[in-house]
Amino acid sequence: MAKAPRAGMVKTRLAPSLSPEAVTAFYCCLLEDTLALARSLSDVEVAIICPDSDVNELAQWIGNEASVVAQKGEGLAAGLTSVFAHFAEGQQRRVIAFNSDSPHLPRSVLEAAFETLAAHDVVVGPTHDGGYYLVGAKASHPTLFAGDGMGTRSALERLLSRARALELSVGFAAPFYDIDVADDLIRLAAELRIAPARAPRTARWLKECELVAAQSRTGTGKL
């Protein structure tokens, strides 16, 4: 799931730390690395689900890397529902939905999530703040997401409650974190200094930002 990379419309919680232009450039890197991660999996179809108003812009930007599909309705819950509805039409049996907030997610986590769906109706990847970064299912369940998205502090609890109400078995992917606020960005930068290949475009952008910041502190450049 994604949005078109427009200033002031993406990763807004990073705005206190970065300029709108920097946030947008960072988001582009996240999206490119996430798309590369998805495409690195074997025998999968990759689609980007986005608001209808973003389809043309994203399609031009992505090119032939993936299909771009308009979600039905507004908000993250509608986006999640649209993911599973889209793939249900094509008879794909195991579907994983995630956004561009975790481009450094190990591919093994996605592979394990698909395997989990062999034994469960739903798979979910928890975050440490009560949300989730990934959700998968073997069929479309229109009421599973009912009004909330992935990032709220009670999102995971509500998702599990609805899964129980629908009598769906749930398996879990490894806990992980996504990039929402400045502390997440600092953590990501530290990890990518050690292993830049996990998200090469994002790692390169972060390194360039660090160089600019260092030049600014020494009076040899400016932000």
What does each model-found stretch correspond to?
Residues M1-L14:
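N-terminal nucleotide-binding beta1-loop-alpha1 segment
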Residues A25-V44:
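A short, N-terminal amphipathic alpha-helix
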Residues D43-S67:
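Acidic donor-binding segment of Leloir-type glycosyltransferases
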Residues Q60-V95, T152:
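Short phosphate-binding loop-to-helix
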Residues F98:
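Catalytic metal- and UDP-sugar-binding loop of GT-A-like glycosyltransferases, i.e.
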Residues P103-G130:
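Conserved donor-nucleotide/metal-binding helix-loop-beta segment in metal-dependent transferases, i.e.
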Residues H141-R162:
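Short, glycine-/small-residue-rich phosphate/pyrophosphate-handling segment
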Residues S161-L223:
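Conserved alpha/beta core of the MobA/IspD/sugar-nucleotide pyrophosphorylase nucleotidyltransferase superfamily
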